[in-house]
From Swiss-Prot:
Compartments, record wording: Mitochondrion inner membrane
PROSITE patterns given in the database record: CYTB_CTER, CYTB_NTER
Other known facts: Heme 1 (or BL or b562) is low-potential and absorbs at about 562 nm, and heme 2 (or BH or b566) is high-potential and absorbs at about 566 nm.
Cofactor note: Binds 2 heme b groups non-covalently.
Residues the entry annotates as binding a ubiquinone: 202
Binding sites annotated in the UniProt record for heme b b566: 98, 197
Name of protein: Cytochrome b
Known partners and oligomeric status: The cytochrome bc1 complex contains 11 subunits: 3 respiratory subunits (MT-CYB, CYC1 and UQCRFS1), 2 core proteins (UQCRC1 and UQCRC2) and 6 low-molecular weight proteins (UQCRH/QCR6, UQCRB/QCR7, UQCRQ/QCR8, UQCR10/QCR9, UQCR11/QCR10 and a cleavage product of UQCRFS1). This cytochrome bc1 complex then forms a dimer.
Transmembrane segments: 34-54, 78-99, 114-134, 179-199, 227-247, 289-309, 321-341, 348-368
Membrane topology reported for the UniProt record: Multi-pass membrane protein
Binding-site positions, heme b b562: 84, 183
Organism classification: Eukaryota, Metazoa, Chordata, Craniata, Vertebrata
Keywords, alphabetical: Electron transport, Heme, Iron, Membrane, Metal-binding, Mitochondrion, Mitochondrion inner membrane, Respiratory chain, Transmembrane, Transmembrane helix, Transport, Ubiquinone
C-alpha cells in the first residue's frame, strides 16, 4: 500500500497536524474564529505592506510626498494604502475580541500559549506605532514625539535612552529611517511568535465554551472548522474592503493630511483609536513616571490573569457574578477609549481617572473575589 504523502512527508505532515487532521473540540463557537482571522489579517498586512514599501521613501523630505504619489500615480496604490491602514484597525478589533474570548472562557490557563499571546499583542502594538509614524503627517510626527518622550521618565537613563532611540535631539530623519526598518522587521517577528503560539496551543489542544476537557469528543479540523473559518474570512474581508472603499479615512486623524511641522503643535495630540484606552490611563495620572507605569501595567496585567484565577470552574459560562464583572470591564474599556479621544478638561479628567481605577480594580481585585465567592455559593 502506498504511503499517504500528507501524513508522511516531513513538511506536509506538520501542516496536516496543524490544519487538517488536528483534533478539535466539537462545540467551539464563533468566538474561536478570531485566531484564524488574525492570521488572515497578518498575511493581508504583510502583502499590502510589501507593495507599499516598494514605493515608499523613508526620508523626512520625501515620505509625505511618496505616500501622496502612491495614492495618485501607482496602479491601485490608493486601494493598497487604504487596505493597509484599515487592515491595522481590523487586526486590533480581532486581537481584542480574541483576548476577550480568552478572559471569558479561561483560555489563559494554557499559560505558555497565553504568555506568548501577550508578547504578540505587545509586538503588534509596537509595529502599529512605528508604522503610524511613516506617512510623516502632523499626527505621525507629534505622536512619535509624545510617545517616545515617555521613555525619558525612566530614572537616570531615561533621557539618554530617548536620544539614543531618536538618533538625535528630536524626532528627525534618523528616527524615520529606523522606524521604517523596524516596521518592516516586526511583522516577521510576529509570524515567528505566531508559530510558537500555535505550537504551545497544539500541545494542550483548544479550550471550549464549557471549560471542560473535550478529549472524549473531538472532530477533525478539516472539513468542519476549515469551512467555518472560510465563512469568517469572507465576512471580515468584505467588511475590510467596504471600509477601505466607502469610508477609508473614517478611523484616521485629519491632522495627518498636513505634512509634519515641528514648529506647529496640533490642538489635540492623540493616537489611533486602538491605543486610546491605554492613552486615557496614561493621561489619568498627574505624574510622568506614574503615568508611564500605569500605561505599561494596563497591558502587562494580562500576564497576571492565570495567577489570579481562583475559581474551581475554568470558564465563566456558569458564573453569573464573574460575567457581570466581565461585561462591566468591557464597558469600562469602551469608556476609556472614548475619554482618550476627548480633550483634557473638566468632566473627562475625572471620568478617565475613575475608569482607570476601576479597570485595575476589576482585573486585580474583583475577579478573584467574585470567583472565590462563587466557589462558596456553589459549594465547590
Amino acid at each position: 500500500m502506498a504511503l499517504n504523502l500528507r501524513k508522511n512527508h516531513q513538511i506536509l505532515k506538520v501542516i496536516n497536524n496543524a490544519l487538517i487532521d488536528l483534533p478539535a473540540p466539537s462545540n467551539i463557537s464563533t468566538w474561536w474564529n478570531f485566531g484564524s482571522l488574525l492570521g488572515i489579517c497578518l498575511i493581508t498586512q504583510i502583502v499590502t505592506g510589501l507593495l507599499l514599501a516598494m514605493h515608499y521613501t523613508a526620508d523626512t523630505n520625501l515620505a509625505f510626498s511618496s505616500v501622496a504619489h502612491m495614492c495618485r500615480d501607482v496602479q491601485f496604490g490608493w486601494l493598497i494604502r487604504n487596505l493597509h491602514a484599515n487592515g491595522a484597525s481590523f487586526f486590533f478589533i480581532c486581537i481584542y475580541l480574541h483576548i476577550g474570548r480568552g478572559l471569558y472562557y479561561g483560555s489563559y490557563l494554557n499559560k505558555e500559549t497565553w504568555n506568548v499571546g501577550v508578547i504578540l499583542l505587545l509586538t503588534l502594538m509596537a509595529t502599529a506605532f512605528v508604522g503610524y509614524v511613516l506617512p510623516w503627517g502632523q499626527m505621525s510626527f507629534w505622536g512619535a514625539t509624545v510617545i517616545t518622550n515617555l521613555f525619558s521618565a525612566i530614572p537616570y537613563i531615561g533621557q539618554t535612552l530617548v536620544e539614543w532611540a531618536w538618533g538625535g535631539f528630536s524626532v528627525d530623519n534618523p528616527t524615520l529611517t529606523r522606524f521604517f526598518a523596524l516596521h518592516f522587521l516586526l511583522p516577521f517577528v510576529i509570524v515567528g511568535l505566531t508559530l510558537v503560539h500555535l505550537t504551545f496551543l497544539h500541545e494542550t489542544g483548544s479550550n471550549n465554551p464549557l471549560g471542560i476537557p473535550s478529549d472524549c469528543d473531538k472532530i477533525p479540523f478539516h472539513p468542519y472548522y476549515t469551512i467555518k473559518d472560510i465563512l469568517g474570512f469572507a465576512l471580515m474581508l468584505s467588511l475590510l474592503v467596504s471600509l477601505a472603499l466607502f469610508a477609508p479615512n473614517l478611523l484616521g486623524d485629519p491632522e495627518n493630511f498636513t505634512p509634519a511641522n515641528p514648529l506647529v503643535t496640533p490642538p489635540h495630540i492623540k493616537p489611533e483609536w486602538y491605543f486610546l484606552f491605554a492613552y486615557a490611563i496614561l493621561r489619568s495620572i498627574p505624574n510622568k513616571l506614574g503615568g508611564v507605569l500605569a500605561l505599561a501595567a494596563s497591558i502587562l496585567v494580562l500576564f497576571l490573569t492565570p495567577l489570579l484565577h481562583t475559581s474551581k470552574l475554568r470558564s465563566m459560562t456558569f458564573r453569573p457574578l464573574s460575567q457581570i464583572l466581565f461585561w462591566t470591564l468591557v464597558a469600562n474599556v469602551l469608556i476609556l477609549t472614548w475619554v482618550g479621544s476627548q480633550p483634557v478638561e473638566h468632566p473627562f479628567i475625572i471620568i478617565g481617572q475613575l475608569a482607570s481605577l476601576s479597570y485595575f480594580t476589576i482585573i486585580l481585585i474583583l475577579f478573584p473575589l467574585a470567583a472565590a465567592l462563587e466557589n462558596k455559593l456553589l459549594k465547590l
